[in-house]
């Protein structure tokens, strides 16, 4: 009788196990180093290659000012010399002393001892940087970008996709609290006044117009402060935001008029048409909740508006630093303009408490790469949930923004949002005065041990109750469909008669907004 030999369990030899373990470790190491940089950005505790401190510091090097409105052709640059810094420091100390007599005076600088200074114009900023894989256009020359936005460059669908590239760039480390605070201070620096000193150089050709006496720091216009790190060859462009009485953005109100016009144009549904009592900032309103889309687009692109002005300032910075990495930042309106500029030219942009800028981005036809994943965006919006302007809740006829003449009707942001939950963490109530930049710096950015986590915005729709038509003529010449019945027996038939109304334009409206007078 045959007996089967007992089965034997096979054991791997030590050499075999060692080979498997070695291969596993090598695969893990290879996977780690092959991991895209944008997936490793969240390691805020790492101070290695993923998060590097800049070898040099950022110092204010120049200031740009650009006229808007009637003075939109004026564009100048001031080199920040030791004489300018000294005079600015004296003015800052004088202004600070005078401000101590007023309890509600907005401070010009942070009260935190870590960032204390007697002269904000002489402050040296330290920023940490990080690598970022960013999808942006291969050709970013301003002339090409402008022709692309204005529809002057024809491309096939294949060419459209081919012009986008995945670019390895250097960006500010938005997970580092100190870097976020420094960028916010750079944004607040654009609010600080500078004395009437130094030589302003014309960026454009000499003008035929006579420069108005009040132009510059005491007149209309937009400003950009340029900070430069000579060691790393990195530029930070800080754009001045809203300065207005009633709407707390800064401590002074030099450009209130044009700031309000541009705020209402950028962030309202249709030319700040909140009710019949409002004076609109453009003539694109057709009738109740109907707006001329092409008219809005033309208004935003006008050369005397802020978007064109900030693009011109960027051109000047690019000419001054052609090989440098350029980052943009700003607060409020300045933050929204920084985001629009970053979207236009593929620049890293960090905005603070900015209104929703998705709507103006679309109206300006700014480049949005097809199928862009959120982690490849280079735009970050920092804010807190007690600021109704940032959260998009400061709207309606009875809102605090409306009471001071602002139609802040947008809520949707592009890029990523980094929100501090001060309502639950600190017990704050929603208040327009929480929008102030130094309240944000002192009590929010410095009030938390870590920077807010940046996430993809939730699904959002602006102006859902408005109808936007291609043009005013399209509304007046639309085909009216009417149905009439034929009573011929034994069946009833229905036929459709199409009639076309003649093209006309409304030239007069009553107080309810209805058209009372037409012009052919």
Swiss-Prot record:
Function: Lipase which is essential for lysis of subvacuolar cytoplasm to vacuole targeted bodies and intravacuolar autophagic bodies. Involved in the lysis of intravacuolar multivesicular body (MVB) vesicles. The intravacuolar membrane disintegration by ATG15 is critical to life span extension.
First-tier enzyme category under EC: hydrolase
Subunit structure, as described in the record: Binds to both phosphatidylinositol (PI) and phosphatidylinositol 3,5-bisphosphate (PIP2).
One function term, GO molecular function aspect: triacylglycerol lipase activity
Catalytic activity: a triacylglycerol + H2O = a diacylglycerol + a fatty acid + H(+)
Signal sequence residues: none
PANTHER family linked: LIPASE ATG15-RELATED (PTHR47175:SF2)
One Pfam match: Lipase_3
The protein's name: Putative lipase ATG15
Species, as recorded: Saccharomyces cerevisiae (strain ATCC 204508 / S288c) (Baker's yeast)
Membrane topology (Cytoplasmic): 1-14
